Design a protein with these regions (language model features):
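Residues that form or flank phosphate/diphosphate-binding pockets in enzymes
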Residues: 25, 49, 79-80, 111
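Glycine/proline-rich, positively charged
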Residues: 80-122
Length: 122
């Protein structure tokens, strides 16, 4: 597996599985099979409506969470919702994500960015 080193020193796999347009059942199976096949980067977003299934696929795979690079995205409608990140983590059934993005620069994305900055734990 090839990796790219991010500015904060974290290594991110160059190849991963995206879960856009996957039903919850398909997302769970795809994540499980991808991790069993050696993938270590999983991408999802709250707009995909499959975060719970992604979390189940990760748990089912038996791969240690610290060996997975998990990324998600916040949708503009939750940029100013103070509980948005905690709710995302609950849906994914994980204590952290490795990369969190603003899905698009719409709505109050400046507040969304500030909220994400406050949530960073090193």
């Amino acid at each position: 597996m090839e990796y790219v080193k991010l500015n904060n020193g974290v290594k991110m796999p160059e190849l991963g599985l995206g879960t856009f347009l996957l039903s919850p059942a398909d997302a769970e199976n795809a994540v499980y099979n991808a991790l069993k096949s050696g993938y270590r980067l999983i991408d999802t977003g709250n707009a995909y409506h499959n975060e719970r299934a992604v979390g189940r696929g990760i748990k089912k795979s038996g791969v240690k969470r610290e060996d997975i690079f998990l990324e998600s995205k916040l949708w503009p409608t939750v940029y100013t919702k103070s509980a948005a990140i905690d709710e995302m983590l609950e849906r994914l059934d994980t204590p952290y994500v490795d990369l969190l993005l603003l899905h698009q620069p719409a709505g109050d994305y400046i507040e969304g960015y500030k909220m994400m900055e406050k949530a960073v734990k090193v």
